[in-house]
């Protein structure tokens, strides 16, 4: 989003007007954040530029919105004047959008102005750590080919046309979730698996300002559902919640717009953004996927790239030979999004793909309560832990943030059996680029 207003008046070059970048986690979408000019990303960090004379006020505002500042960095006035930023430790797709730059999740990445929106990948990085038993762990940080970032920005979005809008929740399920396919003909909107795009809904907010963009994980591979490089798809749930004061039902602006949009309608699209959830290039990598609800979107892109015949034909350089395991949490069986696709892959590739459901309102955990995804992880924690220890294994978590604590507890118990402290081991996984999280 090329929107300097998103950073509350950054870049005054007068004396004493130094600009700082706050890295913030835990921001939640609510009425007050809806009045800001930057989106609250589903996961990771939000980066906010703050002039020196507003640092205290911004700290108070962030605290009020439920955020926590985890780092503060400086941006020189000279860099602001030149329109450049060398602080590229951006770890979140919303930050990319707000800054109109690409990012790297764990490694600083500078955007090459001659690369037309493609950010150069970080160099391969060897991380040598010792586990709790003193054994050296050498892990290679994943390398990726050039990743397209911010090819279309809010001030000049791509205008896509809706091809189809299909329901994903079966009869008897809860809520509205749609699979929406857009025509990309006539543009240059390239993307890869694990990225997101921004959607700008029409109209203005209650303050009379144009609606802000919202970010959605892409649900199709780089070649599109038709494997013709002409489409992009989203998996969107209509946001619905009770107003905390009035008790009235409130519907999300953009999600309602998308879930009810008609084929043939034109939509403003920005992006793509994101590097946190990219699939490793190594076809022999193992991939653990832990998802709830629409968090299945990036997982679908991975599975299509790995197993769909047309995709494999379109990607002769990537023929998946590893092992993948999806643990998918939903409330009811009719809420298993893409159920037929998932089970078809499982039947066709039983040696390479394992599918496990956690159906909270139909299944019980060992304590007699509802079976949530973290309960399934606990059930299979020893197996998952052994797989995670393999240096070729990447773990992806996408969906509700509430599952993270339970997942960590389960893996902590499994690791402890071998004298390993999970929290330390997890840090090494993150540094090695093998632990990928996008939760909200």
UniProtKB/Swiss-Prot annotation:
Entry keyword annotation includes Nucleotide-binding: no
Q: Where is this region: Disordered?
A: 93-142
Residues given in the record as FAD binding sites: 214-217, 235-237, 241, 253-255, 294
Q: Which GO molecular function annotations are given, in alphabetical order?
A: ferredoxin-NADP+ reductase activity
**Can you cite an annotated GO cellular component?**
plasma membrane-derived thylakoid membrane
CpcD-like domain ranges (all copies): 17-75
Which residues does the UniProt record annotate as the domain FAD-binding FR-type? 155-279
The UniProt record lists the keyword Kinase = no
Which UniProt key words apply to this protein? Antenna complex, FAD, Flavoprotein, Membrane, NADP, Oxidoreductase, Phycobilisome, Thylakoid
Q: What is its EC number?
A: 1.18.1.2
Q: Where in the cell is it found?
A: Cellular thylakoid membrane
Stored PANTHER family: PTHR43314
Protein name per Swiss-Prot or TrEMBL: Ferredoxin--NADP reductase
Q: Which organism is it from?
A: Trichormus variabilis (strain ATCC 29413 / PCC 7937) (Anabaena variabilis)
């Amino acid at each position: 989003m090329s929107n300097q207003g998103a950073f509350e008046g950054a870049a005054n070059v007068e004396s004493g007007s130094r600009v700082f970048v706050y890295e913030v986690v835990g921001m939640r979408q609510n009425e007050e954040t809806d009045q800001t000019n930057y989106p609250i990303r589903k996961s990771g960090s939000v980066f906010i530029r703050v002039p020196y004379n507003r640092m205290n006020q911004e700290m108070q505002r962030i605290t009020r919105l439920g955020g926590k500042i985890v780092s503060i960095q400086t941006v020189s006035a000279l860099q602001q004047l030149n329109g450049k930023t060398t602080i590229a430790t951006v770890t979140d797709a919303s930050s990319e959008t707000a800054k109109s730059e690409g990012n790297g999740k764990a490694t600083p990445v500078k955007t090459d102005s001659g690369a037309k929106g493609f950010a150069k990948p970080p160099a391969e990085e060897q991380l040598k750590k010792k586990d709790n038993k003193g054994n050296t762990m050498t892990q290679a940080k994943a390398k990726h080919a050039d990743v397209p970032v911010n090819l279309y920005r809010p001030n000049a979005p791509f205008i896509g046309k809706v091809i189809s809008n299909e329901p994903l929740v079966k009869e008897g399920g809860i809520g509205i979730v749609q699979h929406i396919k857009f025509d990309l003909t006539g543009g240059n909107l390239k993307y890869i698996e694990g990225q997101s795009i921004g959607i700008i809904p029409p109209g203005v907010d209650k303050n009379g300002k144009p609606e802000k963009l919202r970010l959605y994980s892409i649900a199709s591979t780089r070649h599109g559902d038709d494997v013709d490089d002409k489409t992009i798809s989203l998996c969107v749930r209509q946001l619905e919640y009770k107003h905390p004061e009035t008790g009235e039902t409130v519907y999300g602006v953009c999600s309602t717009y998308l879930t009810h949009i008609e084929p043939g309608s034109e939509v403003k699209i920005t992006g793509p953004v994101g590097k946190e959830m990219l699939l490793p290039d190594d076809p022999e990598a193992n991939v653990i996927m832990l998802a709830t609800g629409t968090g299945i979107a990036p997982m679908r892109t991975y599975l299509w790239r790995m197993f769909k015949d047309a995709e494999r034909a379109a990607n002769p350089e990537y023929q998946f030979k590893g092992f993948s395991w999806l643990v998918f949490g939903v409330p009811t069986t009719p809420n298993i999004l893409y159920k037929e696709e998932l089970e078809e892959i499982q039947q066709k590739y039983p040696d390479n793909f394992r599918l496990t459901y956690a159906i909270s309102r139909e299944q019980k955990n060992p304590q007699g309560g509802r079976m949530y995804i973290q309960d399934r992880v606990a059930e299979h924690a020893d197996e998952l832990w052994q797989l995670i220890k393999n240096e070729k294994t990447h773990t992806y978590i996408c969906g509700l943030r509430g599952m993270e604590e339970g997942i960590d507890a389960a893996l902590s118990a499994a690791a402890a059996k071998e004298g390993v402290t999970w929290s330390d081991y997890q840090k090494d996984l993150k540094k090695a680029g093998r632990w990928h999280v996008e939760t909200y």
